[in-house]
Design a protein with these regions (language model features):
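Short, basic/aromatic beta-hairpin or loop at an interaction surface
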Residues: 106-120, 142, 162
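A short glycine-rich beta-alpha junction/loop motif
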Residues: 86-88, 161-169, 201-225
Length: 264
């Protein structure tokens, strides 16, 4: 049942990608070796510059596959802000609020199972009392993590006061152009993951992507009604995958109960 749920989820994401893009995954080509040694000048080694990646055509296929007008994230955002670097506590005391961190972004959603807390006053300033307080609809993206998890995102839709840690960046979009739930879905698709993989850098065992690189990520942006249809398609189908996972958990529990009966 878990495999069926995973296949269901993967199929859903590829189906949504087909709605907005003609991108098809192809097996990597093995480069032809013509020389054992090749001299490369230092000026050609700007590996992590977006311009270099574009020049080499690494992502042109992705951009050309879009079925709708292409926008950079920086063109869609109204504002963005790095999170707090304040030390958080495992125990919530009076005046403290939850701080969302890297482990709290799981499969495109907020997971509240490993929360830490810090004083609400740490998330405010005299001039901006709500500066680091999250609002419903905020888009959170993980800027530092493993290669597979860097760039993972989620939409904040919880009740109450929450803030977020420095390894996350919070975006607020111009909702007359794009809906945050739509952006979040696209950040789970290969057409965005390929862009993140191309620009992320590994240092000290962690991969990083900065705000400029996130801002340069391009996505296809259809009309708001079409975005709403895609969002509905995602959540309606996601319920089906969740049913598979629930059934798998039920089977696992029953198997353990039966095992204990046989042993004891």
């Amino acid at each position: 049942n878990i495999k069926m749920a995973n296949d269901y989820s993967d199929g859903l994401l590829l189906s949504i990608q087909a709605d907005v893009s003609n991108l098809k995954d192809e097996p990597p080509k093995t480069p032809e070796v013509t020389n054992l040694v090749q001299t490369i000048s230092f000026s050609d080694m700007n590996r992590w510059e977006v311009a270099y990646i574009l020049k080499e055509g690494k992502l042109e296929k992705v951009y050309k596959s879009f079925k709708y007008p292409s926008y950079e994230i920086s063109q869609l955002q109204k504002e963005s802000l790095f999170g707090l670097s304040s030390k958080a506590s495992l125990t919530q005391k009076d005046g403290m609020i939850p701080m969302l961190r890297m482990p709290n972004i799981v499969n495109g959603e907020i997971d509240c199972s490993q929360l830490k807390y810090l004083p609400k006053s740490s998330a405010t300033t005299a001039n901006e009392p709500d500066k680091w307080l999250l609002k419903k609809g905020d888009f959170l993206i993980n800027r530092t993590n493993s290669k597979e998890l860097v760039g993972k995102s989620a939409i904040f839709n919880l009740d109450g006061d929450y803030t977020y840690a420095s390894y996350l960046i919070r975006y607020r979009f111009d909702t007359s152009l794009v809906l945050p739930e739509y952006v979040n879905i696209l950040f789970m698709l290969p057409l965005v993951r390929k862009q993140i993989d191309a620009v992320s850098r590994q240092t000290a065992g962690q991969c990083n992507i900065n705000s400029d690189e996130i801002g340069a990520i391009r996505i296809p942006v259809p009309s708001i009604p079409i975005q709403q249809e895609i969002i509905k398609k995602y959540f309606d189908a996601k319920d089906g995958a969740n049913n598979y996972y629930a059934k798998a958990d039920e089977c696992k529990t029953n198997a353990l109960i039966n095992f204990e009966k046989e042993i004891f």
